[in-house]
C-alpha cells in the first residue's frame, strides 16, 4: 500500500501540472460561451426544476433554442468525443444498438470521434458512411487485477484522455453501453462540466437519496447535505474536466482501499459533483430507464437506458 501511495502522489503531482496548464483554456472557454439568456428560457417549464441553486441550467425539452445554439457552435468548428466501454459479452449484444443509434442522433452535423474501449479485437457494425464521424477502437489490456469494472474504466479513460483525447476533441461524453438513442442528443448538452440527473431519484425526496453515509469513506456526504442524485450512465464536459473526475475518483478509491472500506462508482460520482458543482445538468429525458413508467414531465426520451438483460 505504501508503494501505491507513492505512485498516487507522483501521479497527483503530474496531474496537477496538467490542470494548471489547462486553467487558461477553461477560462477562455467559459468566457466564449453563449450567454444563457440567448438560448435558455426556464419559464417555459414551470413543472420541473430548470435552474439549480448555483444557477446552472437543467436541460429539459422546451427550455432551449437549438437553432440559436447551432448557429453559434457551427462557427466554433468544434469536435465532439463519445466514449463507451464494451467488454466481454457487451461487445455485440449492447454495442451494436448503441453505435447504430448514436451515429444517427449524437451531435448530428458535427465532427464526432467515437472511442470504443474493448477487451479484444472488434469488427464494427455496418453503418451508413458519415464523413463527419470517425471511430477509434482501443483495446483494453486483459489484466487479472481488473476485478472492478469501474476502476478499470476510469483508469483506462484517464490514460487515453491524457495521451491523446484531450488533443482531439473539444467536448467529451462518457456513456454506458446499454443505452439506445431515440432523439437528438445535441449541442444543448454542451458545457464545461455536465452531469446527468438520475431518472429514478430525481422524483424522490432529497432526504432519501442513496449517498454514501459512512464517514470512513471518501464518498461520504453527511445527512442533510447534497443537491441531486446523479446517474453514472453519462458524464461529460471539456476533456480536462472529465480527466479531473477520473483523477478524483481513483484517488478516492485508493484511499478507501487503504482504510478498508469501499463504495460504488455512482456514490463517488455524487461526492465529486457535490464538491465540484456541474455547470449544466441533463434532465432524466437524457437517460430514461425503460423499466419505469414515463411521467408527464418527460416529454421526449432522448436516450433510453436498458437493464443489461433487456437488449
UniProtKB/Swiss-Prot annotation:
GO terms for molecular function: glycosyltransferase activity; hexosyltransferase activity. Its main location: membrane. Its EC number is 2.4.1.-. It is an enzyme of class 2 (transferase). Residues 27-311 are lumenal. The chain crosses the membrane at residues 6-26. Residues 1-5 are cytoplasmic. It is found in: Membrane. The active site is at residue 266. GO terms for cellular component: Golgi apparatus; membrane; vesicle. It comes from the Eukaryota. Binds 1 Mn(2+) ion per subunit. Keywords: Glycoprotein, Glycosyltransferase, Membrane, Signal-anchor, Transferase, Transmembrane, Transmembrane helix. It is a single-pass type II membrane protein. GO terms for biological process: carbohydrate metabolic process; lipid glycosylation. InterPro entries: Glyco_trans_6 (IPR005076), Nucleotide-diphossugar_trans (IPR029044). Glycans are attached at residue 77. Its cofactor is Mn(2+). Substrate binds at residues 85-90, 176-178, 198-201. Belongs to the glycosyltransferase 6 family. This is Glycosyltransferase 6 domain-containing protein 1. The lineage of its organism: Eukaryota, Metazoa, Chordata, Craniata, Vertebrata.
Amino acid at each position: 500500500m505504501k508503494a501505491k501511495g507513492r505512485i498516487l502522489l507522483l501521479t497527483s503531482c503530474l496531474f496537477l501540472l496538467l490542470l494548471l496548464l489547462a486553467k487558461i483554456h477553461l477560462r477562455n472557454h467559459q468566457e466564449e460561451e453563449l450567454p444563457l439568456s440567448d438560448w435558455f428560457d426556464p419559464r417555459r417549464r414551470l413543472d420541473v426544476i430548470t435552474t439549480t441553486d448555483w444557477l446552472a441550467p437543467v436541460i429539459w425539452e422546451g427550455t432551449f433554442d437549438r437553432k440559436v445554439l447551432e448557429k453559434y457552435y457551427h462557427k466554433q468548428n468544434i469536435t465532439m468525443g463519445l466514449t463507451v466501454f464494451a467488454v466481454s459479452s457487451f461487445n455485440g449484444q449492447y454495442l451494436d444498438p448503441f453505435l447504430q443509434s448514436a451515429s444517427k442522433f449524437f451531435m448530428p452535423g458535427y465532427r464526432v470521434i467515437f472511442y470504443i474501449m474493448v477487451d479484444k479485437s472488434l469488427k464494427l457494425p455496418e453503418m451508413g458512411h458519415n464523413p463527419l464521424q470517425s471511430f477509434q477502437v482501443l483495446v483494453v489490456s486483459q489484466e487479472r487485477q481488473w476485478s472492478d469494472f469501474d476502476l478499470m474504466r476510469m483508469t483506462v479513460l484517464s490514460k487515453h484522455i491524457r495521451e491523446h483525447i484531450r488533443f482531439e476533441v473539444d467536448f467529451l461524453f462518457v456513456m454506458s453501453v446499454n443505452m439506445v438513442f431515440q432523439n437528438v442528443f445535441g449541442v444543448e448538452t454542451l458545457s464545461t462540466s455536465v452531469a446527468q440527473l438520475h431518472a429514478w431519484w430525481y422524483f424522490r425526496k432529497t432526504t432519501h437519496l442513496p449517498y454514501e453515509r459512512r464517514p470512513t469513506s471518501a464518498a461520504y456526504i453527511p445527512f442533510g447535505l447534497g443537491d441531486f442524485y446523479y446517474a453514472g450512465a453519462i458524464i461529460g464536459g471539456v476533456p480536462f474536466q472529465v480527466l479531473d473526475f477520473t483523477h478524483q475518483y481513483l484517488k478516492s478509491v485508493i484511499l478507501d482501499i487503504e482504510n478498508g472500506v469501499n463504495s460504488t462508482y455512482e456514490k463517488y460520482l455524487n461526492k465529486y459533483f457535490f464538491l465540484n458543482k456541474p455547470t449544466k445538468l441533463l434532465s432524466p429525458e437524457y437517460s430514461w430507464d425503460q423499466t419505469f413508467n414515463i411521467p408527464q414531465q418527460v416529454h421526449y426520451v432522448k436516450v433510453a437506458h436498458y437493464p443489461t438483460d433487456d437488449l
